Amino acid sequence: KQGLETLDPNGGMAEEENQRATRGLSTVVHPMIAEAATQFNAKAIAELYPSGGPVKTVIVGDPSEEMEEQAKRVKDYMNYQITQEMPEYFPDLDQMLFQLPLVGHTFKKVWWDANLDRQCSQFVKAEDFIVSPDSKDLYTSSRYSHVIRMPRNDYNKYVKAGYYLQSEYSGNDTDPSGDIGSEIEGVDPYGDEGTDEVMTLIEMHTYYTFDGIDGGEDDDDDNVIALPYVVTIDYDAEKVVSIRRNWDEDDEKQQRRDWFVSYKFLPGTGFYGFGLFHMIGGLGKAATGS
């Protein structure tokens, strides 16, 4: 939160500029950071989403004609999925690559959507992804959570598809991270009662042991090995709406499946990376003041 609070539309200098305006001074902000973020976005999007599609294949070992044809089929099909069946992929990637250099850390979630019946890719903001700052990396973290905001009508579709349990809407007066995001974007959240109901879900990817299953008989047994699950909670109703196994059914080792990709701009002092506001935010202020 400390790093994100600097990301208001004026580069973290809103209060200072209000004081300058009161004194009759110029409120023009030096575009140093905005220019750097725009240049990074333009170069990165060209590399990660070329005109032919973002997927490339590499054959490990000695290639044969049959393997090359198979690799081409895989590449063509995956590019078709991304460019034709996933309309959210490009705008989400574009937005992520602009925010990444600013905040220093972003995430992408890739999963099979039970409602849309297809693969989906979603840009997840840093303030909507909760993980211990002491974690070494995403893949060795014992628990992390994704804050999901979903229109009530969409939630009902997932209930009908058997993905979530029914949960009565109880309002969203509080939000675990919405206040931070609204402050960053400079907007005031609002909603029309009855027509704009938004469910706030906490999707926790964690290790747990349930009574009577997982090979454990006693929760106090220190030798019991917890297994990976995805537990989803209705934040406002304080109700569990989904518990799902998070390993392949045929996997004897029962290893956790990871649905998120972590992107760092620069290495930080902990789990989260550093961005331009962390590194040259003070320089931007100095350039504006001069």
Outline where the language-model segments fall.
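Extended alpha-helical, oligomerization-prone segments that build pores/tubes and scaffolds
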Residues: 1-290
